[in-house]
Swiss-Prot record:
Protein name per UniProt: Prokaryotic ubiquitin-like protein UBact
Basic and acidic residues compositional bias, start-end: 1-28
Keyword Magnesium part of the UniProt annotation: no
Gene Ontology MF terms: protein tag activity
Post-translational changes noted in the entry: May be modified by deamidation of its C-terminal glutamine to glutamate by the adjacently encoded deamidase. This could be a prerequisite to the subsequent conjugation, as shown in the other prokaryotic ubiquitin-like protein Pup.
Organism phylogeny: Bacteria, Candidatus Yanofskyibacteriota
Keyword Nucleotide-binding: no
Gene this chain is encoded by: ubact
Family: Belongs to the ubiquitin-like protein UBact family.
Length: 56
């Protein structure tokens, strides 16, 4: 894997760009879906805590 990363850096026409500028619209859509999934997981965990009877 490190060789692939070095190769990408070596052939990058503009190495000064950061990752956010390299993203394609599909990459941005994937990030949005991942963020949405993270929110759903977070909400589900909170709801599960509320439904769980408190142990005393």
């Amino acid at each position: 894997m490190p060789q692939d990363q070095q190769r990408k850096k070596q052939f990058d026409p503009n190495p000064n760009r950061d990752d956010s500028q390299r993203k394609t619209p599909v990459d941005k859509e994937i990030d949005d879906i991942i963020d949405e999934a993270d929110e759903i997981v977070k909400r589900n965990k909170e709801q599960a805590k509320k439904k769980q009877p408190s142990r005393q």
